[in-house]
Regions:
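A hydrophobic, small-residue-rich beta->alpha segment in the mid-to-C-terminal subdomain
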Residues: 108-150
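A generic local secondary-structure boundary/capping motif
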Residues: 2, 28-29, 101-103, 112
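Short acidic-glycine loop/turn motifs at beta-strand connectors
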Residues: 33-35, 81-84, 117-121
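Cysteine/selenocysteine-centered motifs that mediate thiol-based redox chemistry or coordinate metal-sulfur cofactors
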Residues: 149-166
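Phosphate/ribose-recognition catalytic cores of enzymes acting on nucleotide-derived substrates
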Residues: 54-99, 105
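Hydrophobic residues embedded in beta-strands of well-ordered beta-sheets
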Residues: 37-38, 74, 122
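Charge-rich, low-complexity N-terminal segments
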Residues: 1-62
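Short solvent-exposed loop/turn micro-motifs enriched in small/polar/acidic residues
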Residues: 22-23, 107-109
Length: 166
């Protein structure tokens, strides 16, 4: 496969804060493009070898399958152990709807995170950080609605949560 062909299957993901300022960016391989979403795969290459968030420990080399939506106030990261492929869980960021193009995804993070363990247990993170943000009432309403939508999807085992245990 020529480099140009491989390059066509990649894009750059930009994580922005609530003010639209870049916090982090990385390259990801496009897995699927839908009408209102893109699914990509990336390796965790954090600034540290290991990052703990709630019950989940991210390690350099972990595999992230990520869904970004331009019509939903969240994204979903499926986290697999880079060494053995085991499902670590799902990390869902509450965000404004993503901006999607052929080469770039941008998502404005609103601090709230929904972690889903492999057994389906749900943990909400960073409520205090979210409450301290200077957000509009509409943004707050949409963010809390997104948390509820994710919880409902997990309980119903709607894809990609259909592989969770009980």
């Amino acid at each position: 496969m020529a480099f140009e062909e491989l390059h066509d299957n990649w894009l750059t993901v930009y994580k922005l804060n609530e003010r639209g300022e870049e916090v982090w960016h990385y390259n990801a391989e496009i897995i699927e493009n839908g009408a209102n979403f893109v699914c990509v795969r990336a390796l965790f290459v954090g600034r540290r070898d290991e990052v703990r968030s709630g019950f989940m420990v991210f390690r350099r080399g972990d595999v992230m399958t990520e869904w970004f939506f331009n019509d939903r106030w969240y994204n979903i990261f499926r986290v697999q152990d880079g060494a053995n492929g085991a499902l670590k869980g799902f990390y869902c960021n509450i965000t404004r709807p993503a901006q999607l193009s052929e080469e770039v995804v941008t998502a404005e993070d609103l601090a709230l995170d929904v972690l889903v363990a492999p057994n389906g247990e749900i943990t909400l993170l960073d409520e205090e950080e979210f409450e301290a943000m200077p957000l509009s009432a509409e943004d707050r309403t949409q963010a809390w609605a997104a948390v509820e939508q994710l919880k409902q999807r997990v309980v119903a085992r709607t894809p990609p949560f259909d592989e969770l245990g009980h």
